[in-house]
Amino acid sequence: MEIDLNADLGEGCGSDEALLDLVTSANIACGWHAGGAPAMRDCVRWAVEKGVSIGAHPSFHDPENFGRKEMDLPASEIYAGVLYQLGALSAIAQAEGGRIAHVKPHGALYNQAARDAEIADAVVSAIHDFDPSLAVFGLASSGFVDAARHAGLVAVEEVFADRGYRADGSLVPRSQPGALVDDEREMLARTLEMVRGQRVRAVTGEWVPLNAQTVCLHGDGPHALAFAKRIREALEAAGIDVHAPGALHAGERA
């Protein structure tokens, strides 16, 4: 049994370098919701040094709301925005001796792409047209994952250690009760169940089947680093191999 651990980096949380010792894939903010060129370069350099797979973390252009505000934009604008952000991170990665291996949308763009076919197609088209060898990280069992596979891209299904789920497999919105799981024991138990049992219990009590291929560890909580360490240890103690999906890694060139 195997699993990937990923974290969203370059968002100003201050623990990026330490998290890169624990995760196997890094989703690096591309400046539109957080971060910027210096942070992108730092994260890429650290990822290359530590052998962590590099991913782009594009979003809506919304630094005021950390990219978490839903937007109604033309598909052409979403396409162009994703393409722009991929190009920026790719240039930095190339200069640092690495390359992008995957793409994971951020925040509202991630959630809207999971349920809106037009947005999913716009994001997938941008990724495919930029580099069809890139893998796509998306919410497990979502329409975004289906769209990526339909376009011939490798899709990696993502689950969340610290987020509540609804019965349809979607995440509980952050504005609603049950959105965040902050009890460490519960997070560890849920993560092991998602990876080994391929299911998660919804906030309404039902078991929801899912295909867990990568687990997101958010790096912006007060205990995020300690929890990331414990979850890595728990997975390895359970005999689960932790590594990035596929053969693409940070230090490889195309």
Swiss-Prot record:
Function per UniProt: Catalyzes the cleavage of 5-oxoproline to form L-glutamate coupled to the hydrolysis of ATP to ADP and inorganic phosphate.
Catalyzed chemical reaction(s): 5-oxo-L-proline + ATP + 2 H2O = L-glutamate + ADP + phosphate + H(+)
The family this protein is said to belong to: Belongs to the LamB/PxpA family.
Complex formation: Forms a complex composed of PxpA, PxpB and PxpC.
Alphabetical list of SUPFAM superfamilies matching this protein: Glycoside hydrolase/deacetylase (SSF88713)
Lineage: Bacteria, Pseudomonadati, Pseudomonadota, Betaproteobacteria, Burkholderiales
CDD domains found in the cross-reference section: LamB_YcsF_YbgL_like
InterPro entries the UniProt entry points to: Glyco_hydro/deAcase_b/a-brl, LamB/YcsF/PxpA-like
EC nos: 3.5.2.9
Keyword vocabulary terms for this entry: ATP-binding, Hydrolase, Nucleotide-binding
Pfam families listed in its UniProt record: LamB_YcsF
Gene3D superfamilies for the chain: Glycoside hydrolase/deacetylase
UniProt-recorded name of the protein: 5-oxoprolinase subunit A
GO biological process: carbohydrate metabolic process
Keyword Nucleotide-binding: yes
Transmembrane segments: none
Enzyme class: hydrolase
GO molecular function: 5-oxoprolinase (ATP-hydrolyzing) activity; ATP binding
